[in-house]
Amino acid sequence: MGKKAVFLDRDGTLNIDHGYVHQIDDFQFIEGVGKALKQLQDKGYLLVLVTNQSGIARGYFSEQQFQQLTEWMDWSLDEDYGVVLDGIYYCPHYPEGQGEYQQKCDCRKPKAGMFQQAIKDLNIDPAQSYMVGDKLEDLLAAETAGVKTKVLVRTGKAITAEGEKKADLVLNSLVDLVPYVN
C-alpha cells in the first residue's frame, strides 16, 4: 500500500506571492505554515512540493536561482520547524517561454506530470492524499492524478467560482487544514 501525502503548491500557499519570487530577501512564509507542515508530517504525511515556475522560461530568473532559493527554503523549514520536504518537483516550462524552456510539457499544472512522477518516485497513494493550492490549475492537476482531497486556500490568488466548485475544501490558509487531516 502506498504512502499518504500532502502535495503543496509554493507561491500563495507556502509563501506570500509577490510575483515570480526568486530571491531569499523576497521570500516570506505565510504565517503559521512551518508549524502546520510539522503537524502534517507528524501525522504521517509525506510533504511534496509541486510548483510551476514559468519565471524561468520567461527569463525573469535562472533555474540555478530557483534552486538556490528552494535549497534555502528547504533548509529554513528544517532548521526552524524540523520539517523535511520529501519531494520537490517543479516545472520550468512555459509555451511562450524562451529557449529550451519554451515547450508544451506534461509537467506544467493543470497537467499532472509532477504529481505522477512524485507518486511513482515516493510510492504515494493518491487516494489517501491531499493537494493544497491557491488556483484552479492546482486542483485540476491533482484531480487528474487521482488525489482524493483538493484544498483551495485564500492566501494566494483570488478564488474563482470555478475553483471553489472544484475544491473539496476552501480554507483561509494551509494552517486550517491540520484539523481536517488524521
UniProtKB/Swiss-Prot annotation:
Recorded superkingdom: Bacteria
Name of the protein in its database record: D-glycero-beta-D-manno-heptose-1,7-bisphosphate 7-phosphatase
Binding positions (Zn(2+)): C91, H93, C105, C107
Site positions for Stabilizes the phosphoryl group: T51, K109
GO biological process, one term: carbohydrate metabolic process
Catalytic activity: D-glycero-beta-D-manno-heptose 1,7-bisphosphate + H2O = D-glycero-beta-D-manno-heptose 1-phosphate + phosphate
InterPro entries: HAD-like_sf, HAD-SF_hydro_IIIA, HAD_sf, Heptose_bisP_phosphatase, Histidinol-phos
NCBIfam families in UniProt: GmhB_yaeD, HAD-SF-IIIA, Histidinol-ppas, PRK08942.1
Keyword DNA damage in record: no
CDD domains linked: HAD_HisB-N (cd07503)
Subunit structure as annotated in this protein's UniProt entry: Monomer.
UniProt source species: Haemophilus ducreyi (strain 35000HP / ATCC 700724)
Pathway given in the UniProt record: Nucleotide-sugar biosynthesis; ADP-L-glycero-beta-D-manno-heptose biosynthesis; ADP-L-glycero-beta-D-manno-heptose from D-glycero-beta-D-manno-heptose 7-phosphate: step 2/4; Bacterial outer membrane biogenesis; LOS core biosynthesis
Keywords: Carbohydrate metabolism, Cytoplasm, Hydrolase, Magnesium, Metal-binding, Zinc
MF (Gene Ontology): D-glycero-beta-D-manno-heptose 1,7-bisphosphate 7-phosphatase activity; magnesium ion binding; zinc ion binding
Cofactor: Mg(2+); Zn(2+)
Family stated for the protein in its record: Belongs to the GmhB family.
Record's GO cellular component terms: cytoplasm
Binding residue positions for substrate: D9, R10, D11, D17, H18, G19, Y20, T51, N52, Q53, S54, R108, K109, K135
Enzyme class: hydrolase
Site (Contributes to substrate recognition): R108
Active-site feature positions: D9, D11
